[in-house]
């Protein structure tokens, strides 16, 4: 329990470090590895004013993510536990893309030995739909929360077995693997929700 809690290292998108000083202060209170998610890169590229800006942003993302992979590898060797929210964001009702798992998760499956899928049913924070991108605008309310976990899953076996079910012509097997993980999360969440 307590020993494990001291060894948790969260994966945090760079938005938590850059967008708001107060959010950054909270994020810095946790041990974390910062990544540049592909979803953020896609948004940044769409906002880029020139091809040079796009190239610079891609280079920045590669640099951050390479450093993150090295840091995660060190965490693994040091016996630390990596905490990842596989969609990389909070679920927003009416925005199904916020429930889609990030393709990068496949790299983590190849890197780590085991995983446990943890679901949280219920939330004491509600997204303020007038300010959905501002975490500080979230509304706080009482809630019953139920945390549940899957059995321990061997990452490499899980990935290998699932990839074997895909046709050879599958265009994006990495995304399919994380889509399958998200399906398992949904099943686990629905099962607990019926009990809550």
Residue ranges of model-derived segments:
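Non-catalytic C-terminal accessory region of glycerolipid acyltransferases
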Residues: 49-196
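Catalytic core of membrane glycerolipid acyltransferases/transacylases, capturing the structured
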Residues: 1-57
